[in-house]
Swiss-Prot record:
Domains as described in the record: The DPH-type metal-binding (MB) domain can bind either zinc or iron ions.
InterPro entries reported in the protein's UniProt record: DnaJ_domain, DPH3/4-like, DPH_MB_dom, DPH_MB_sf, J_dom_sf
Claim: Ion transport is one of the keywords in the record: no
Family indicated by similarity: Belongs to the DPH4 family.
GO cellular component: cytoplasm; nucleus
The protein, known as: Diphthamide biosynthesis protein 4
Origin superkingdom: Eukaryota
Location(s), subcellular: Cytoplasm; Nucleus
Function description: Required for the first step of diphthamide biosynthesis, the transfer of 3-amino-3-carboxypropyl from S-adenosyl-L-methionine to a histidine residue. Diphthamide is a post-translational modification of histidine which occurs in elongation factor 2.
Pathway linked to the protein: Protein modification; peptidyl-diphthamide biosynthesis
Binding-site positions, Zn(2+): C128, C130, C156, C159
Organism: Gibberella zeae (strain ATCC MYA-4620 / CBS 123657 / FGSC 9075 / NRRL 31084 / PH-1) (Wheat head blight fungus)
Classification via SUPFAM superfamilies: Chaperone J-domain, CSL zinc finger
Length: 188
């Protein structure tokens, strides 16, 4: 791995780019990045082969075939890569504080109760400072997917800003907060 990509201390926290030992910037410069990704995939398989791993430096980080294959699949698909890059930007520490801090550049924290609900479209929404009145928009199904975490990260439809929506799932029979895998606008 190059020194710029060895920022990960373990195979569990490595990005797909680190697994394949390539950079996003390199892929962005390619008209068709598929051959480059495939070459990186084959190199990663050879570098992390079990026969070679057993004889190498124990302090080195090695990746599994599953990690390498997942990296190939995500980075080879343009739509999956765009979604992955967006998720990386949100999860990386930025600005004055990291993931555990209260401030991240381009990410605003709000409570679900502070958002408007459109009955006709059955979605929550909020305007963005870029001017779009419905720039942050999501539905009940989006909340259900992340009900265990209690937060949903939504990107603006028109710019690069993000909204982290915090919520709690309430039991229908009680007003107490209950861990649940179902969410409804009436329960929230």
């Amino acid at each position: 791995m190059t020194s710029s990509q060895s920022i990960s201390s373990s195979a569990d926290t490595a990005t797909h780019y680190q697994v394949l030992n390539i950079t996003s910037a390199l892929l962005d410069t390619q008209h068709d990045s598929t051959p480059l990704i495939k070459r990186a995939y084959h190199r990663a398989l050879l570098r992390n082969h079990p026969d070679k791993v057993a004889n190498s430096d124990p302090s080195s980080v090695f990746f599994t075939v599953d990690q390498i294959t997942t990296a190939l699949n995500v980075l080879s698909s343009p739509s999956a890569r765009v979604a992955y890059d967006a998720a990386l930007r949100v999860s990386r520490p930025t600005g004055a504080a990291g993931r555990d801090g209260s401030f991240q550049t381009g990410v605003e924290n709000v409570d679900l109760d502070d958002l408007a609900f459109d009955e006709d479209q059955e979605c929550w929404y909020r305007p963005c400072r870029c001017g779009n009145e419905h720039s942050y928009e999501f539905r009940e199904a989006d909340l259900e997917e992340v009900s265990e975490e209690g937060e949903l990260v939504v990107g603006c439809l028109d710019c690069s800003l993000w909204l982290r929506v915090h919520f709690a799932v309430l039991d229908e029979n009680e007003d107490d907060v209950q861990p649940s895998s179902t969410t409804s606008k009436d329960k929230i």
